[in-house]
Amino acid sequence: MSELRSELKYLESHEWARVEEDGTVTIGITDHAQEALGDVVFVEVPEVGSQVSIGEEAGVVESVKAASDIYSPVSGEVIAVNEALEDAPETVNSSPYDDGWFFKVKPDDLDELEKALSMEDYKAAIESDD
């Protein structure tokens, strides 16, 4: 069973979002997603200073099996990207919720995350897919 964390919000497209103490949002892909993808070999993230929109493509993750778009769970300005993934994309496999995060956003409206799934709802969604 994939690891899930109760403090995160989830998208059905398998991204997670964590609201930080300063109100920014950190985004990555779920443990379930990295397991399905297999060995991650490349991650493309948006540029710092760029704008992302809720539900819109914000990047790409590539594995030995497939390439998958990354969608943003909130609209806002990208304020940081995980540059370590450029040299070590496999970190997404070993630490999807910690060291394997993709980018951070200063959200235009934090209430947009209300549209995301709780851990329980995401768990039900992935179990119905299996």
Curated annotation (Swiss-Prot):
Q: Which UniProt keywords are listed?
A: Lipoyl
Q: Which Gene3D superfamilies match?
A: 2.40.50.100
On the tree of life, the source organism's domain of life is Bacteria
Q: Which residues carry this modification: N6-lipoyllysine?
A: 65
Occurrences of domain Lipoyl-binding (ranges): 24-106
Q: Which InterPro entries match?
A: 2-oxoA_DH_lipoyl-BS (IPR003016), Biotin_lipoyl (IPR000089), GCV_H (IPR002930), GCV_H/Fam206 (IPR033753), GCV_H_sub (IPR017453), Single_hybrid_motif (IPR011053)
**Which protein is depicted?**
Glycine cleavage system H protein
Name the gene behind this protein. gcvH
